[in-house]
Swiss-Prot record:
InterPro entries: DUF5396
Coiled-coil intervals: none
Keywords: Cell membrane, Lipoprotein, Membrane, Palmitate, Signal
GO CC terms: plasma membrane
Top-level taxon in the UniProt lineage: Bacteria
Lipid moiety-binding region (S-diacylglycerol cysteine): C25
Native source organism of the sequence: Mycoplasma pneumoniae (strain ATCC 29342 / M129 / Subtype 1) (Mycoplasmoides pneumoniae)
Compositional bias of kind Low complexity: 110-131, 145-156
Broad class of the protein's primary localization: membrane
Name of protein: Uncharacterized lipoprotein MG321 homolog
């Protein structure tokens, strides 16, 4: 089905009538919390939950559901009437699990010994059917804490503060969760569900196994686009949810075909008709085991995501979530894969699906769905949860507060913040955002009432970025054609994304437009702006006193309390992120900086005689008393070019690509919003004007035609056109998978099995690999790197991954896991003039001195390039050691870099375009990958090992300019919201929804 475009014209959304206001605006009962949203959750009734489980409803309704772990918010948000005084504190805790044990495989020398009697593992846990208990060594145990044991909020710990957390998270490949089987499933009336024998249906490990299976199946059937979690965590699917035999062996079925020998055994897959969803790995209702192929430090955090929540395995419509005879799921086969046919599938036969969504659904969470219709959904507090789970969580509410009994969410598609503000005034809502256009009115109207609360964002909860498409071409039959809504010239611009011209255009848009001036239109209180793929507030820095502190809005001159301040700020400390490095006059009140120059570096490869490589190899061999057996002469080389981007060179780059007044670049900016506030209208009008002005040639030709397109990026009807596969620009809306900088990097570098991505943000993964190859291809580096990876030293593999603690100190339990020092690499000048390498890897004292004089360059270029190169070599070796990249292909690539890197780095009169599917963006590196789809996972793990690792990856991606700058509430933004005085809201700093922890004060309190 083709996406229906939602075009937006000047001031069009201001015409939204008050007719869309709530029909029932009467004052609500004190214990009923009423909110409204512009999202049309039930627009497509056939797929309201999108994934056969509770997602995406949990994205809209916060923590009304429950999982193995959860984030809670303790304390209260308080303000002085203008600014925030105190905010809630966040903790990651066990929720439906009473404890979790981490296990690692015993080595062969000790495998015959009995299970470890580690004092933190109080009992011998029962193994699953996949392996014997004696094969595993218990690392440690974390238990659920109780608020009824006298602990207060300050005494209760987050999982991440537990003594054994670091060791478990770094070493465990099996997590055994003890399930709280005392809690009962309740129906839409809040009553315990009974089985056929009249017994209460209680929570079981099988409910989690079924939840995992439903999520995996929907991913395998290409029904949801979040299946990457399986690769990200490294889930061992067969051991965790696969079918079993009584003897514990993996189920096999006999196959006999022309392609396979008679009697050869084949594992039953989850997409096979023969897969039996009622054959469980979890034989003990109280134990659920999650197996990983290698340690993943963020597994416990990720278990708080809705994709891994339980669904009742005994429910008839849960049993129906399978393929095969009599299944409501209908699929088509294409290229050996099964793809869900959403037209023919009977969603009414699936749990939580169809027009009867949520009808006859069960709950073990803090709220259950009592009723719903097209315009509203009603949640009621689950007394079973409060009886069995709430006492075992840290206390969240004050003594005079109670949990909110009823929550109602209205859907008002297309409504603006101004409409919601009016609804609040009329008494129809319990809370509402205060749009900037109404802030003065709110201050006056609600002075002294207690309704006006001030909020300051602590961490970014979600990125909403406008990106460049990485799918300019598609294959139809045997023919490569431009994708729909993309012209041939636009396809050339997108395809040759590594070219000097494409880089000039992207850098010019980010650096020659005065985005911070525009941001003040949308966020008048601060003008906060983010240029980076990684938003503010992510790094936990180590202060001078050794304490771990969250990033603060402080000056970044030498002597700052932050030793490693990545998010520096200039221009009145209002600009955040990796800011485009530019020179010239900063014209504050101009939206296009016509006299400015943006500094970038362009990297390319070229064929050579190989003499430079031969000389380097010979010198290396002589200095190390060894023959040069590790590297033959290079047959091509890499080079750098400093590029100054001005308005004139920007226009010239557009013309060289082929854009003109009659053939312009259609800059269709897609948004996640289904409506805009008055400030939003003004902001995007100004953005359109700035883009038009920047792209206007001296003769008046307009080479850029901007367009604003509204849409609901979180709704179930999002399709390929909207997320950017068939237009120049796409939209990426994403929330962090866990609490760390690596989570943003794994999202930004996600690839498919062939090395391609959905939007260019994800194609940044290929750009990172390209940069690593550039670094290793330097003439004084390649032979040394080759010798290093040929050595049988793989200490950097994930089996020994060590992640820094919150205070940046290394875990004392680490073994031989030190990162390569690369002391033998003493010369690497490729990046010495790169302004972004200089900014982040140059000498700190030189940076401070040059900043004090107003210079935008900093540090010693030669030293910065060397440090940057060493980081690149460390990551490249890490990826080789962990089987993400093929060692022999990497050696081949740095011997002849032009073979892999020369594909899309030049604009050549329209001839440089793909001739087959294998030539698509990123696919030129496909031979180098062993596991392209896991690149993002290992990028994130490596990033979390050290702040400078993360800084390296961010520098590489941000200087590629894959996303547009975006105004986003940051460290300086304090904004008002409306909330009835008897309610207390709590939002976790990580942005995780904590509606479960909201409270209301009864009238007699």
């Amino acid at each position: 089905m083709k996406f229906q475009r939602k075009y937006w014209g000047l001031l069009s959304t201001l015409g939204v009538s008050s007719a869309v206001a709530l029909s029932a605006c009467a004052a609500q009962a004190r214990d009923v919390y009423v909110t409204s949203s512009a999202s049309d959750l039930l627009k497509n009734n056939s797929v309201p939950m999108s994934m056969f489980n509770v997602s995406p409803t949990s994205s809209f309704f916060g923590s009304k559901y429950a999982g193995l772990t959860t984030y809670i918010a303790t304390g209260s948000n308080k303000d002085d009437g203008v600014n925030v005084a105190t905010q809630t504190q966040e903790k990651l805790v066990l929720e439906l699990a009473t404890s979790v044990k981490g296990y690692k495989k015993k080595d062969k020398a000790t495998s015959s010994q009995k299970t470890s009697t580690n004092s933190s593992c109080t009992t011998t846990s029962s193994g699953t059917s996949t392996s014997g208990e004696d094969d595993w060594e218990c690392i440690g145990e974390i238990k659920r804490q109780s608020s009824s044991n006298g602990q207060n909020n300050q005494q209760s710990k987050s999982i991440t503060e537990e003594e054994k957390f670091q060791e478990i998270s770094q070493k465990a490949t099996r997590y055994e969760f003890a399930i709280d089987t005392g809690i009962k499933w309740v129906d839409n009336n809040g009553k315990p569900v009974k089985d056929a024998s009249g017994n209460d249906v209680k929570l079981s490990s099988k409910d989690f196994e079924r939840g995992f299976e439903a999520y995996i199946l929907s991913s395998e059937l290409r029904f949801n686009r979040n299946g990457y979690f399986i690769d990200l965590m490294g889930l061992d699917v067969k051991k965790t949810v696969g079918m079993t035999k009584k003897n514990g062996a993996q189920v096999q079925m006999k196959v006999a075909s022309s392609d396979e020998k008679d009697g050869e055994e084949k594992t039953v897959k989850i997409t096979d008709d023969a897969y039996n969803p009622e054959d469980y790995q979890s034989t003990d209702d109280s134990k659920f085991n999650v197996y990983l192929t290698s340690p993943f430090p963020f597994l416990l955090s990720m278990m708080s995501k809705e994709f891994f929540f339980p669904i009742p395995h005994t429910h008839p419509k849960v049993k129906a979530i399978k393929v095969g005879k009599d299944s409501p799921l209908v699929y088509n086969e294409k290229n050996g894969s099964k793809i869900l046919d959403q037209t023919k599938t009977n969603f009414d036969g699936i749990y939580g699906g169809g027009v009867n969504a949520w009808r006859d659904t069960w709950s073990v969470g803090p709220y259950y769905v009592e009723s719903f219709n097209q315009s509203q959904i009603v949640f009621k507090r689950n007394s079973e949860y409060d009886t069995h789970i709430t006492p075992n969580l840290p206390k969240t509410r004050e003594d005079n507060e109670k949990p909110i009994p009823t929550m109602i969410n209205y859907f008002q598609p297309g409504a603006t913040p101004e409409v919601f503000y009016s609804n609040y005034i009329a008494g129809g809502l319990s809370s509402a955002e205060v749009p900037y256009s109404q802030q003065e009115d709110a201050r006056s109207r609600f002075a002294g009432t207690g309704d006006l609360r001030w909020v300051k964002v602590q961490k970014t909860a979600q990125s909403a970025q406008i990106t460049y498409s990485s799918r300019p071409y598609v294959v139809e039959g045997e023919t490569v054609k431009t994708n729909s809504n993309i012209t041939e010239t636009e396809a050339k611009f997108l395809y040759n994304s590594e070219s000097e011209e494409a880089l000039t255009i992207r850098a010019g848009i980010n650096g020659l437009i005065n985005w911070q001036n525009l941001a003040i239109i949308l966020l008048p209180n601060s003008g906060d702006l983010n240029y980076s793929i990684v938003p503010f507030g992510i790094f936990k820095e180590k202060g001078k006193n050794g304490a771990s502190v969250q990033q603060k809005a402080v000056s970044t001159t030498e002597g700052s309390d932050l030793m490693n301040d990545y998010y520096y700020k200039i221009e009145k400390e209002q600009r955040l992120g990796l800011i485009p490095q530019r020179e010239g006059n900063y014209e504050k009140n101009k939206n296009v900086l016509e006299s400015a120059t943006v500094k970038i570096n362009y990297y390319s490869s070229k064929a050579t005689s190989g003499q430079a490589g031969a000389a380097a190899s010979a010198a290396f061999a002589k200095n190390n008393n060894t023959s040069d057996n590790t590297q033959q002469n290079q047959t091509s080389s890499v080079e750098a070019k400093s590029v100054n981007v001005t308005k004139h060179s920007f226009v010239q780059a557009l013309k060289k690509v082929g854009f003109s007044g009659s053939n312009p670049l259609h800059f269709n900016m897609k948004l996640g919003n289904s409506s805009l506030s008055a400030n939003g209208v003004d902001y995007y009008n100004a953005v359109k004007q700035a883009l038009t002005e920047l792209g206007t040639a001296d003769n008046g030709e307009k080479l850029i035609v901007p367009e604003i397109i509204l849409g609901d990026a979180q709704g179930p009807t999002r399709n390929e056109w909207y997320i950017g596969l068939s237009s120049v620009l796409g939209f990426s809306s994403w929330s962090p998978d866990y609490d760390g900088v690596g989570t943003w990097l794994d999202a930004a570098t996600q690839l498919n099995d062939q090395g391609g991505g959905d939007v260019i943000t994800y194609s940044s993964g290929a750009h990172i690999v390209r940069t690593l190859l550039l670094a290793a291809s330097q003439k004084d580096v390649h032979s040394k790197f080759t010798q290093k990876i040929d050595q049988q030293n793989t200490a950097s593999t994930t089996s020994d991954v060590t992640v820094k603690k919150a205070d940046s100190s290394q875990d004392s339990s680490k073994s031989n896991t030190e990162e390569e020092k690369w002391d033998d690499v003493t010369s690497a000048d490729l990046f010495k003039d790169d302004p972004y390498v200089l900014k982040n890897f140059g000498d700190a004292k030189a940076q401070a001195a040059q900043r004090s004089t107003g210079s935008t360059t900093s540090g010693n270029g030669t030293q910065a390039s060397l440090e940057f190169t060493k980081k690149a070599l460390s990551l490249l070796k890490f990826l080789v050691d962990n089987g993400i990249l093929d060692k022999e292909k990497v050696k081949e690539a740095i011997k002849d870099p032009n073979k892999y890197l020369g594909k899309r780095d030049k604009i050549e009169n329209g001839t440089n375009k793909p001739s087959k599917n294998e030539d698509f963006i990123g696919y030129e590196l496909k031979d180098i990958y062993k596991k392209a789809a896991q690149l993002n996972r290992f990028n994130s793990i490596w990033a979390e090992k050290d702040t400078d690792n993360a800084k390296f990856l961010i520098t590489v991606v941000d200087s590629y300019f894959p996303v547009l700058p975006v105004p986003a509430a940051g460290l300086n933004e304090t904004s008002p919201t409306l909330l009835k005085p008897w309610f207390q809201f709590r939002s976790a700093p990580s942005g995780n929804g904590t509606i479960r922890d909201y409270g209301f004060i009864p009238e007699n309190k």
